[in-house]
């Protein structure tokens, strides 16, 4: 059995398929995790220190709704955006991902949330990178971000279960 504070995420990049698979077990209910994945709370966990920092997020969380995130990456501003393809709270969230101003380069992010031993296992699948290098970099970024998500939600879980 893992500790409540064990927030290690794992990510692997399949460079040939241009696919990232990542997972983390979060000490929180699926409903709470889903909210963190689909709200402005993204600005708290969607970070990789020294590489990127998400500062703003907006979204219309419904099938066909749009989302937009902005921040800084290596000292330069960035904007990511996409469309929600599936919204099945608190089990599954699927959206497209593209850098604003870079039409035609669209990838897809799928989050699956499963209750496991009083926690929520988040499994992420990000498919459709423009290059192998980008795929490899995103594997590191997703691992860092999912670890941060688990770290942020663990203290809430401990408070709720005293």
What are these regions (language model features)?
Residues 1-53:
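Hydrophobic ligand-binding cavity/cleft-lining segments
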Residues 32-35, 39-44, 139-152:
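K/E-rich alpha-helical interaction surfaces of small helical-bundle regulatory domains
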Residues 21, 41-77, 161-162:
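Short beta-edge strand/loop motif at the mouth of beta-sheet-based domains
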Residues 88-93:
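Short, conserved beta-turn/loop elements at beta-strand boundaries and strand-helix junctions
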Residues 14-16, 74-78, 102-105:
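A generic structural micro-feature
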Residues 24, 57, 80-85, 97, ...:
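Hydrophobic/aromatic beta-strand elements that line small-molecule binding cavities or substrate pockets
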Residues 151-162:
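Short, highly charged C-terminal tails/helix-capping segments
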């Amino acid at each position: 059995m893992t500790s409540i504070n064990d927030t290690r995420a794992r990510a692997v990049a399949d460079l040939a398929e241009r696919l990232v698979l990542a997972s983390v077990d979060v000490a929180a209910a699926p409903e709470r995790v889903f909210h963190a994945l689909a709200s402005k709370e993204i600005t708290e966990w969607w970070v990789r220190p020294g590489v990127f920092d998400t500062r703003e997020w907006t979204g219309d969380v419904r099938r066909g709704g749009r989302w937009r995130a902005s921040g800084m990456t290596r000292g330069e501003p960035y904007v990511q955006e996409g469309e929600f393809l599936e919204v099945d709270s608190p089990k599954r969230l699927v959206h497209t991902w593209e850098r604003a101003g870079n039409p035609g380069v669209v990838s897809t992010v799928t989050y699956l949330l499963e209750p496991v031993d009083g926690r929520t296992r988040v499994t992420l699948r990000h498919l459709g990178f423009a290059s192998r290098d980008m795929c490899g970099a995103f594997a590191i970024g997703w691992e860092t971000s999912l670890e941060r998500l688990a770290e942020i939600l663990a203290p809430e879980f401990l408070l709720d279960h005293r």
